[in-house]
Amino acid sequence: CHHEGLPCTSGDGCCGMECCGGVCSSHCGNGRRRQVPLKSFGQR
């Protein structure tokens, strides 16, 4: 299985974690705020 912080796809299985935004995260619900900066890149 994949460890936390490693890239993953919707089909890959993480070690007791979920695949959030293409990365294994043990706190998927709290990680929503980290996905917000993706929009800031477009503003540059």
UniProtKB/Swiss-Prot annotation:
A GO term, aspect molecular function: toxin activity
Protein name: Conotoxin Fi11.11
Disulfide bonds: 1-15, 8-20, 14-24, 19-28
Pfam families associated with the record: Conotoxin_I2
Residue ranges listed under propeptide: 35-44
Comment block on domains: The cysteine framework is XI (C-C-CC-CC-C-C).
InterPro entries registered for this protein in UniProt: Conotoxin-I_CS, Conotoxin_I2
Tissue: Expressed by the venom duct.
Asparagine amide found at: 30
Organism for this UniProt entry: Conus figulinus (Fig cone)
Location, primary (coarse class): secreted
